[in-house]
Amino acid sequence: MQASRYAFCVLALLGVASIPASGTDWPRFRGPNGSGIADATGLPADLGDQRNILWKIFLPWGHSSPIISGNHIFLTAAEGGEETDAGREKVVDAGGQLVTFAIDRGNGEILWKKAAPRPRMERYEKTNSPASPSPVTDDENVYVFFGDFGLISYTVEGDERWRLPLGPFNNVNGHGSSPILVDDKVILVCDSDTAPYMLAVDKNTGKVIWKTDRPETTRSYVTPAVFQPKDGPLEVIVPSAYFLASYSADTGEKLWWVNGGGWQTKSTPIIHGDMIYSNSWEGGGQIPADGIPTFTEAIKKADKNGDGVMNEQELKIVEPKRKLYLIDLDHDKLVDQRDWEFHRIRRTSKSSLMAVRHGGRGNLTETDHLVWSLEKFLPNVPSPLIYDNVLYLIKDGGILSTLDPQTGEIFKQGRLRKALDKYYASPVGADDKVYMISHRAQGRRSVGDTDFPRLRGGGLRHARHRRESPVYSDSQYALLSGPTDKSIEARASS
């Protein structure tokens, strides 16, 4: 392992000195239904304090967030490999194992560690890792996903129950989507630049119940949320590149959608009453649609050899400033109609935070179900948070925005002092506080609605490069930091 790959990172539990087990506390990425909200009380005002440490252990690197079930903490990591350059700011984790850890919540003891098969080693973006998807649990079993293998289920005691190989995937940045549990199904979004899909797997057998192709999208890194309407089937809400959609949890049928958003979606949707909020950052330049030729027009102008596609030299005739690899989705070194149509959509796409009222079917883009949208001040990776009827957005540079979730009106906006950093971790609301952790682990908390003067900050000593979202449970607070070596601390509240 190269020494440059290591840094000291921290996961902390803050709470009572005696840590009780209490069922499923934080069962999936972003907690209950991805909300980022916990019922915890007695949490600290500042995150940088080093007092009251109960235990600390060290773990290998990875970007998955921990989950909590009873007396167990589960998380995944990559162990023993070596990052090698794969070109174009992509890397491959060569030779390492993909592992799942179970940790005793009370004393930090590693209860078990299991390695997954690794039939391939797909490349990923340097800020990602091969162990980014977070586990999910139903208290009795835990389910994990690795892009280099697929899905695996273990009992909470570490016995393997089943495995389902998936892939390979064509996702140049690696994976970021975590599995969720819906009734008796494990649901997973497998978006990529070719053949994207979503599937539901029987949580008891690992058999595929349904699989829904998603040809209208490309790569994304989202974890869904679940919406239960008053009437009708349970719905799985899935943000995507270029649209937000709902699917029947029972059948995988696409029920409704709203077009719009950026071309790389990373945030988890938020359900608040009958409203759904979806953030999609990274627009393509907002070029007018008529400013980019259709495929027919491009071929007529550029296809000099008459084969019906464009090679690298021909592409320069119609897109002299665009690299072939950015348009060629299937990596065959040619631009066909699918490649070009998604290129046009990408170039015209806009970052967007959409607020959608549930209740329709089919295409809701031009209906009053799209209540409001915002195209500025949006996060790249962090998910929105709605806490105490205030919508929080934290983006790179420490720019914090608070909004009225009903109207989209901005209450207040400003930069967090001493936290002008990149933000990958999503904010979490608990105990009348909102916690935000930056890339370099500059901890911040806000108390009370939009009152910025009551923000406090504190660096998490020895913690660097935080990308996982905080985890809260009962009167405890858990924080995981990566992407390199992780350490775990348990603390008592003061």
Where are these regions (language model features)?
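Short, linear, compositionally biased motifs with a strong N-terminal bias
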Residues: 13, 491-493
